[in-house]
Amino acid sequence: MSQVSAEDKLDYVKSKIGEYPNFPKEGILFRDIFGALTDPKACVYLRDLLVQYIRQSQPEVEVIVGLDSRGFLFNLLLATELGVGYTPIRKKGKLAGEVVSVEYQLEYGSDTFELQRTAIQPGQKVVIVDDLLATGGSLLAASELVRKVGGVVLESLVVMELVGLDGRKKLDCKVHSLIKY
């Protein structure tokens, strides 16, 4: 059986990402990662691509951080495959115990992310992984939370980036996206 190239894996994953015009509102083209996650081969390829990138770019990673909620969908798989810890960043009120919080801006309003204070130890090296980079607000808030508890943000890694929204410019860490629209 022949090896599938990273480029072919990425093309296959892209082919499974759904496009929905005028959702959630008029003028928006929504790109839906769930199409790739319902296809077993695309799911394995996506995991392979993310793991390969992290192994090459950040081999010293100790914790994968996933953002509420689509960031949860593949991050436990990544952490398990890499042999590192996993911790979630959740919306306000969803985590037990002592938490640290950061309010961040959305397109229309604001929201709050929380992280359990003891989830990341001071000095631990972290890669933040999410499905999408749009305006950058959620990834910036996640970086701030990791630093508040003493973690070191090595990089943020996303499956898709909407480059026209310039979210990357707001971020204060290295960023890599598998797919750019």
Swiss-Prot record:
Q: Where in the cell is it found?
A: Cytoplasm
rRNA-binding as a keyword of this entry, yes or no, is: no
GO process terms (BP): adenine salvage; AMP salvage; purine ribonucleoside salvage
This protein's pathway reads: Purine metabolism; AMP biosynthesis via salvage pathway; AMP from adenine: step 1/1
Any Pfam family the entry gives: Pribosyltran
- Catalytic activity entry: AMP + diphosphate = 5-phospho-alpha-D-ribose 1-diphosphate + adenine
Q: What is its EC number?
A: 2.4.2.7
The record describes its quaternary structure and partners as: Homodimer.
PANTHER family to which the protein is assigned, alphabetical: ADENINE PHOSPHORIBOSYLTRANSFERASE (PTHR32315:SF3)
Q: Can you name this protein?
A: Adenine phosphoribosyltransferase
- Natural source organism: Drosophila pseudoobscura pseudoobscura
Gene expressing this chain = Aprt
